[in-house]
Design a protein with these regions (language model features):
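Register position in tetratricopeptide repeats
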Residues: 18-19, 52, 86, 120, ...
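Terminal, low-structured helical/coil segments at or just beyond the last alpha-helical repeat
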Residues: 137-166
Length: 166
């Protein structure tokens, strides 16, 4: 259990992140005691700092440690997969997400991120299947797909290409 003094430090760092100030968030993080830094809350904060700084390999390393601490939480699988994909390991992210799908078969967000991986790998039929499955299971995934900033671009490009039949 984290005492109130250190909760304030975590909250201050989270506030800095929300304000787009990752350097200040890191400074707050560094002032936390070692046991808080190494707990899931502290590691999650550090992972988010790395995400904000686009330090994908560092994010991947921390995300894996969080996943090891709490493998029953689907969010940790997703965070680790995102970090793998963004650090140019989409095939590793895909393997991890397929494992997550076995463990969490009803989780739409796993399908959504599998669609992103499959797009990056050029497997558009599989990407479409996972995207359709995610949208069927969760309205939020529909919004994610519609507001996508490029991860699913190969699907949209493929849909807009003229279809000729010989």
């Amino acid at each position: 259990m984290i005492d109130d003094h250190y909760k304030m430090g975590l909250m201050a760092a989270e506030g800095y992140l929300e304000l787009g100030m990752p350097e200040e968030a890191l400074r707050e993080f560094q002032n936390l005691p070692r046991d808080v830094k190494l707990g899931v809350e502290g590691l999650t904060l550090l992972m988010e700092i790395h995400r904000a700084e686009e330090e994908w390999e560092a994010m991947e390393s921390v995300a894996e440690r969080i996943w090891e601490a709490e493998p029953e939480n689907v969010t940790h699988w997703i965070d680790w997969a995102i970090a793998l994909r963004l650090s140019n390991s989409p095939s590793s992210a895909r393997v991890l997400l397929l494992e997550a799908l076995e463990k969490f078969p009803e989780e739409a967000i796993v399908h959504y991120h599998l669609a992103c991986c499959e797009c990056q790998l050029g497997n558009l039929p599989s990407a479409r299947e996972h995207l359709m499955e995610s949208k069927k299971r969760c309205r939020i995934c529909r919004v994610l797909a519609l507001t996508d900033e490029g991860e699913l671009q190969p699907i949209w490009t493929d849909y807009s290409a003229p279809q000729f039949q010989c």
